[in-house]
Protein backbone atom coordinates (compact mmCIF):
# COMPACT_ATOMS: atom_id res chain seq x y z
CA UNK A 1 0.00 0.00 0.00
CA UNK A 2 2.75 2.43 0.95
CA UNK A 3 6.41 2.58 1.86
CA UNK A 4 7.45 4.65 4.88
CA UNK A 5 11.05 5.69 5.55
CA UNK A 6 11.57 6.29 9.27
CA UNK A 7 14.56 7.22 11.44
CA UNK A 8 14.19 6.23 15.10
CA UNK A 9 16.11 4.78 18.04
CA UNK A 10 14.48 1.34 18.10
CA UNK A 11 12.45 0.12 15.11
CA UNK A 12 11.07 -2.81 17.12
CA UNK A 13 9.44 -0.49 19.66
CA UNK A 14 6.36 1.74 19.58
CA UNK A 15 7.23 4.81 17.53
CA UNK A 16 4.98 7.05 19.61
CA UNK A 17 7.13 6.34 22.69
CA UNK A 18 10.45 7.50 21.23
CA UNK A 19 12.10 10.20 19.18
CA UNK A 20 11.54 9.60 15.48
CA UNK A 21 11.03 11.32 12.16
CA UNK A 22 9.28 10.24 8.96
CA UNK A 23 11.58 11.01 6.03
CA UNK A 24 9.41 9.90 3.14
CA UNK A 25 6.04 8.38 2.33
CA UNK A 26 6.00 6.50 -0.98
CA UNK A 27 2.46 5.70 -2.08
CA UNK A 28 3.61 3.28 -4.79
CA UNK A 29 6.65 1.43 -3.44
CA UNK A 30 8.73 -0.50 -5.95
CA UNK A 31 9.53 -4.11 -5.08
CA UNK A 32 12.99 -3.59 -6.54
CA UNK A 33 13.75 -1.32 -3.58
CA UNK A 34 13.68 -4.43 -1.41
CA UNK A 35 15.65 -6.68 -3.76
CA UNK A 36 19.02 -5.73 -2.23
CA UNK A 37 17.84 -6.09 1.36
CA UNK A 38 18.41 -9.26 3.33
CA UNK A 39 17.19 -10.38 6.74
CA UNK A 40 19.48 -11.57 9.51
CA UNK A 41 19.12 -15.16 8.35
CA UNK A 42 20.13 -14.24 4.80
CA UNK A 43 16.68 -14.37 3.22
CA UNK A 44 15.83 -11.77 0.59
CA UNK A 45 13.14 -9.32 1.70
CA UNK A 46 11.76 -9.20 -1.86
CA UNK A 47 11.50 -13.00 -1.98
CA UNK A 48 9.68 -13.02 1.35
CA UNK A 49 7.14 -10.51 0.04
CA UNK A 50 6.49 -12.57 -3.10
CA UNK A 51 6.26 -15.82 -1.09
CA UNK A 52 3.62 -14.21 1.12
CA UNK A 53 1.50 -13.32 -1.93
CA UNK A 54 1.39 -16.77 -3.55
CA UNK A 55 1.00 -20.29 -2.22
CA UNK A 56 3.70 -22.89 -2.77
CA UNK A 57 3.98 -23.79 -6.44
CA UNK A 58 1.81 -20.87 -7.61
CA UNK A 59 3.11 -17.94 -9.63
CA UNK A 60 -0.01 -15.82 -9.98
CA UNK A 61 -0.31 -16.42 -13.73
CA UNK A 62 -3.50 -17.22 -15.60
CA UNK A 63 -3.58 -19.15 -18.89
CA UNK A 64 -2.85 -16.74 -21.75
CA UNK A 65 -3.44 -17.90 -25.33
CA UNK A 66 -2.20 -15.86 -28.28
CA UNK A 67 -3.25 -16.65 -31.84
CA UNK A 68 -2.07 -15.40 -35.22
CA UNK A 69 -2.68 -16.10 -38.88
CA UNK A 70 -4.37 -14.95 -42.05
CA UNK A 71 -7.92 -15.36 -43.32
CA UNK A 72 -7.89 -19.01 -42.21
CA UNK A 73 -7.75 -17.87 -38.56
CA UNK A 74 -11.07 -16.00 -38.63
CA UNK A 75 -13.30 -17.29 -35.82
CA UNK A 76 -10.37 -19.05 -34.15
CA UNK A 77 -10.35 -16.78 -31.11
CA UNK A 78 -14.09 -17.16 -30.58
CA UNK A 79 -13.80 -20.96 -30.73
CA UNK A 80 -10.96 -21.06 -28.17
CA UNK A 81 -12.85 -18.60 -25.98
CA UNK A 82 -15.97 -20.75 -26.10
CA UNK A 83 -14.12 -23.95 -25.19
CA UNK A 84 -12.26 -22.37 -22.27
CA UNK A 85 -15.45 -20.71 -21.02
CA UNK A 86 -17.33 -23.99 -21.09
CA UNK A 87 -14.40 -25.71 -19.39
CA UNK A 88 -15.03 -23.45 -16.40
CA UNK A 89 -12.67 -20.51 -17.02
CA UNK A 90 -13.93 -16.94 -16.83
CA UNK A 91 -12.36 -16.00 -20.15
CA UNK A 92 -11.54 -12.70 -21.83
CA UNK A 93 -11.09 -12.36 -25.60
CA UNK A 94 -9.41 -9.67 -27.68
CA UNK A 95 -10.20 -10.28 -31.35
CA UNK A 96 -11.19 -8.62 -34.61
CA UNK A 97 -14.82 -8.73 -33.45
CA UNK A 98 -14.09 -6.68 -30.36
CA UNK A 99 -13.19 -7.01 -26.70
CA UNK A 100 -15.12 -9.66 -24.79
CA UNK A 101 -14.75 -9.77 -21.01
CA UNK A 102 -16.34 -12.89 -19.55
CA UNK A 103 -19.02 -13.31 -22.23
CA UNK A 104 -19.91 -9.64 -22.56
CA UNK A 105 -18.70 -7.55 -25.48
CA UNK A 106 -17.59 -4.32 -23.83
CA UNK A 107 -16.08 -2.89 -27.01
CA UNK A 108 -17.37 -3.92 -30.43
CA UNK A 109 -14.77 -3.53 -33.15
CA UNK A 110 -15.29 -0.46 -35.29
CA UNK A 111 -11.57 -0.29 -35.98
CA UNK A 112 -9.84 -3.68 -35.89
CA UNK A 113 -6.57 -2.13 -34.76
CA UNK A 114 -8.28 -0.88 -31.58
CA UNK A 115 -9.31 -4.33 -30.37
CA UNK A 116 -6.22 -6.33 -31.35
CA UNK A 117 -3.64 -3.98 -29.88
CA UNK A 118 -1.59 -3.75 -26.70
CA UNK A 119 -4.22 -1.77 -24.79
CA UNK A 120 -7.00 -4.25 -25.57
CA UNK A 121 -4.77 -7.11 -24.44
CA UNK A 122 -3.96 -5.35 -21.18
CA UNK A 123 -7.67 -4.82 -20.56
CA UNK A 124 -8.07 -8.59 -20.76
CA UNK A 125 -5.45 -9.07 -18.06
CA UNK A 126 -6.28 -6.25 -15.68
CA UNK A 127 -9.63 -7.64 -14.51
CA UNK A 128 -9.35 -9.65 -11.31
CA UNK A 129 -12.30 -11.79 -12.41
CA UNK A 130 -10.61 -13.04 -15.58
CA UNK A 131 -9.20 -16.57 -15.22
CA UNK A 132 -7.97 -17.06 -18.80
CA UNK A 133 -7.26 -14.70 -21.70
CA UNK A 134 -7.29 -15.25 -25.47
CA UNK A 135 -5.66 -12.55 -27.59
CA UNK A 136 -5.09 -12.04 -31.28
CA UNK A 137 -1.61 -10.74 -32.08
CA UNK A 138 -0.28 -9.72 -35.47
CA UNK A 139 2.92 -8.34 -36.93
CA UNK A 140 1.75 -4.72 -36.91
CA UNK A 141 0.81 -4.70 -33.22
CA UNK A 142 4.04 -6.49 -32.29
CA UNK A 143 6.15 -3.98 -34.22
CA UNK A 144 4.33 -0.86 -33.04
CA UNK A 145 3.52 -1.76 -29.43
CA UNK A 146 4.89 -5.16 -28.50
CA UNK A 147 3.02 -7.98 -26.81
CA UNK A 148 0.61 -7.14 -23.96
CA UNK A 149 2.00 -10.03 -21.87
CA UNK A 150 5.48 -11.17 -20.84
CA UNK A 151 4.91 -14.93 -21.21
CA UNK A 152 2.05 -17.05 -22.54
CA UNK A 153 0.70 -20.53 -21.95
CA UNK A 154 -0.13 -21.28 -25.59
CA UNK A 155 0.81 -19.64 -28.89
CA UNK A 156 -1.27 -20.64 -31.92
CA UNK A 157 -0.07 -19.90 -35.45
CA UNK A 158 -2.05 -21.01 -38.49
CA UNK A 159 0.34 -19.02 -40.72
CA UNK A 160 2.63 -16.01 -40.54
CA UNK A 161 -0.30 -13.88 -41.67
CA UNK A 162 -0.39 -11.08 -44.24
CA UNK A 163 2.56 -8.77 -44.82
CA UNK A 164 0.50 -5.86 -46.11
CA UNK A 165 1.27 -2.50 -44.52
CA UNK A 166 4.53 -3.59 -42.91
CA UNK A 167 6.83 -1.88 -45.39
CA UNK A 168 7.29 1.15 -43.15
CA UNK A 169 8.86 -1.21 -40.61
CA UNK A 170 11.18 -2.58 -43.31
CA UNK A 171 9.37 -5.93 -43.27
CA UNK A 172 9.74 -6.59 -46.98
CA UNK A 173 10.41 -10.32 -47.19
CA UNK A 174 9.42 -13.62 -45.56
CA UNK A 175 12.59 -13.79 -43.47
CA UNK A 176 11.92 -10.48 -41.74
CA UNK A 177 8.25 -11.35 -41.34
CA UNK A 178 9.27 -14.61 -39.65
CA UNK A 179 11.54 -12.72 -37.24
CA UNK A 180 8.58 -10.65 -36.10
CA UNK A 181 6.06 -13.47 -35.71
CA UNK A 182 8.52 -15.72 -33.87
CA UNK A 183 8.02 -13.36 -30.93
CA UNK A 184 4.74 -15.04 -30.00
CA UNK A 185 6.49 -18.42 -29.77
CA UNK A 186 9.61 -17.05 -28.06
CA UNK A 187 7.59 -16.13 -24.96
CA UNK A 188 5.79 -19.46 -24.45
CA UNK A 189 6.44 -20.81 -20.95
CA UNK A 190 8.43 -24.01 -20.49
CA UNK A 191 5.26 -25.74 -19.27
CA UNK A 192 3.24 -24.28 -22.14
CA UNK A 193 2.86 -25.19 -25.81
CA UNK A 194 2.83 -23.85 -29.35
CA UNK A 195 0.15 -25.12 -31.74
CA UNK A 196 1.58 -24.85 -35.25
CA UNK A 197 0.35 -25.58 -38.77
CA UNK A 198 2.58 -28.32 -40.18
CA UNK A 199 1.35 -27.58 -43.71
CA UNK A 200 2.88 -24.08 -43.60
CA UNK A 201 6.52 -24.41 -44.64
CA UNK A 202 7.25 -20.92 -43.31
CA UNK A 203 6.29 -22.01 -39.78
CA UNK A 204 8.46 -25.13 -39.54
CA UNK A 205 11.64 -23.44 -38.22
CA UNK A 206 9.67 -21.64 -35.52
CA UNK A 207 9.18 -24.87 -33.56
CA UNK A 208 12.83 -24.83 -32.47
CA UNK A 209 12.28 -21.50 -30.71
CA UNK A 210 9.59 -22.74 -28.31
CA UNK A 211 10.55 -23.49 -24.70
CA UNK A 212 7.47 -25.65 -24.29
CA UNK A 213 5.73 -28.49 -26.12
CA UNK A 214 4.84 -28.44 -29.82
CA UNK A 215 1.42 -29.63 -30.98
CA UNK A 216 1.33 -29.85 -34.77
CA UNK A 217 -1.85 -29.85 -36.84
CA UNK A 218 -2.14 -30.71 -40.53
CA UNK A 219 -4.64 -31.39 -43.29
CA UNK A 220 -3.53 -35.01 -43.56
CA UNK A 221 -2.07 -37.66 -41.22
CA UNK A 222 0.51 -38.32 -43.95
CA UNK A 223 2.21 -34.98 -43.34
CA UNK A 224 5.92 -35.79 -42.86
CA UNK A 225 6.36 -33.38 -39.93
CA UNK A 226 3.33 -34.85 -38.20
CA UNK A 227 4.48 -38.43 -38.80
CA UNK A 228 7.92 -37.77 -37.29
CA UNK A 229 6.31 -35.94 -34.39
CA UNK A 230 4.13 -38.96 -33.61
CA UNK A 231 7.14 -41.28 -33.76
CA UNK A 232 8.74 -39.13 -31.06
CA UNK A 233 5.66 -39.41 -28.85
CA UNK A 234 4.24 -35.96 -29.58
CA UNK A 235 0.65 -34.78 -29.83
CA UNK A 236 -1.06 -33.73 -33.04
CA UNK A 237 -4.36 -32.98 -34.75
CA UNK A 238 -5.20 -33.79 -38.37
CA UNK A 239 -7.98 -34.06 -40.92
CA UNK A 240 -8.90 -37.44 -42.41
CA UNK A 241 -11.98 -38.24 -44.51
CA UNK A 242 -13.65 -35.02 -43.43
CA UNK A 243 -13.17 -35.79 -39.73
CA UNK A 244 -10.81 -34.06 -37.32
CA UNK A 245 -8.70 -36.57 -35.39
CA UNK A 246 -6.36 -36.17 -32.45
CA UNK A 247 -3.44 -38.47 -31.72
CA UNK A 248 -0.62 -38.86 -29.23
CA UNK A 249 2.49 -40.82 -30.12
CA UNK A 250 2.03 -43.96 -32.15
CA UNK A 251 -1.37 -44.73 -30.67
CA UNK A 252 -4.21 -44.84 -33.21
CA UNK A 253 -5.81 -41.48 -33.94
CA UNK A 254 -9.25 -40.85 -32.48
CA UNK A 255 -12.07 -39.14 -34.38
CA UNK A 256 -13.30 -36.00 -32.68
CA UNK A 257 -15.70 -34.03 -34.90
CA UNK A 258 -16.73 -33.69 -38.54
CA UNK A 259 -15.65 -30.60 -40.47
CA UNK A 260 -19.16 -30.44 -41.94
CA UNK A 261 -20.39 -29.53 -38.45
CA UNK A 262 -18.66 -26.16 -38.65
CA UNK A 263 -20.84 -25.02 -41.59
CA UNK A 264 -18.19 -22.60 -42.77
CA UNK A 265 -17.85 -20.85 -39.40
CA UNK A 266 -14.25 -22.04 -39.15
CA UNK A 267 -11.70 -23.13 -41.71
CA UNK A 268 -10.12 -26.56 -41.33
CA UNK A 269 -6.93 -24.90 -40.10
CA UNK A 270 -8.87 -22.78 -37.63
CA UNK A 271 -10.83 -25.73 -36.26
CA UNK A 272 -7.72 -27.88 -35.80
CA UNK A 273 -5.81 -24.98 -34.24
CA UNK A 274 -8.61 -24.31 -31.74
CA UNK A 275 -8.71 -27.97 -30.75
CA UNK A 276 -4.92 -28.07 -30.36
CA UNK A 277 -4.99 -24.95 -28.16
CA UNK A 278 -7.66 -26.34 -25.85
CA UNK A 279 -5.86 -29.70 -25.67
CA UNK A 280 -2.64 -27.88 -24.75
CA UNK A 281 -4.48 -26.41 -21.75
CA UNK A 282 -5.52 -29.93 -20.66
CA UNK A 283 -9.13 -29.61 -21.76
CA UNK A 284 -10.14 -33.22 -22.33
CA UNK A 285 -11.08 -34.35 -25.86
CA UNK A 286 -14.53 -35.28 -24.58
CA UNK A 287 -15.12 -31.75 -23.30
CA UNK A 288 -13.63 -30.28 -26.48
CA UNK A 289 -16.17 -32.23 -28.53
CA UNK A 290 -19.06 -31.22 -26.29
CA UNK A 291 -17.92 -27.58 -26.27
CA UNK A 292 -17.64 -27.40 -30.05
CA UNK A 293 -21.04 -29.03 -30.50
CA UNK A 294 -22.60 -26.49 -28.14
CA UNK A 295 -20.60 -23.68 -29.77
CA UNK A 296 -21.96 -24.55 -33.19
CA UNK A 297 -25.51 -25.28 -32.09
CA UNK A 298 -25.90 -21.99 -30.22
CA UNK A 299 -24.09 -19.91 -32.81
CA UNK A 300 -21.26 -18.78 -30.55
CA UNK A 301 -19.14 -17.90 -33.59
CA UNK A 302 -21.71 -15.31 -34.65
CA UNK A 303 -23.06 -14.15 -31.31
CA UNK A 304 -21.37 -15.48 -28.12
CA UNK A 305 -23.97 -15.61 -25.38
CA UNK A 306 -23.87 -15.72 -21.62
CA UNK A 307 -24.52 -19.45 -21.56
CA UNK A 308 -21.93 -21.39 -19.64
CA UNK A 309 -21.41 -25.00 -18.67
CA UNK A 310 -19.71 -25.62 -15.32
CA UNK A 311 -17.43 -28.68 -15.16
Which ranges hold each PLM region?
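Conserved nucleotide-sensing/catalytic segment adjacent to the nucleotide-binding pocket
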Residues: 100, 104-145, 157
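ATP-dependent carboxylate activation and anion-phosphoryl transfer catalytic cores
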Residues: 1-66
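Protein kinase-like catalytic core scaffold
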Residues: 21-23, 133, 194
Amino acid sequence: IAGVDVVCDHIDQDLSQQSMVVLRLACRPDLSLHSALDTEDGRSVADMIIDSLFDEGQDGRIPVVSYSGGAESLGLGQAIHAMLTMAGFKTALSSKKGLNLIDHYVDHARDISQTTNWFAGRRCLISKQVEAAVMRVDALSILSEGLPFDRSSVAVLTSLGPRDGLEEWDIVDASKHFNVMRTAVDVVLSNGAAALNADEVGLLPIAELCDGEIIWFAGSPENAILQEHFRQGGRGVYLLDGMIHYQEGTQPGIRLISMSSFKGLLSAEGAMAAIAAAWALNVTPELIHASLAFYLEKGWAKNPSNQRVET
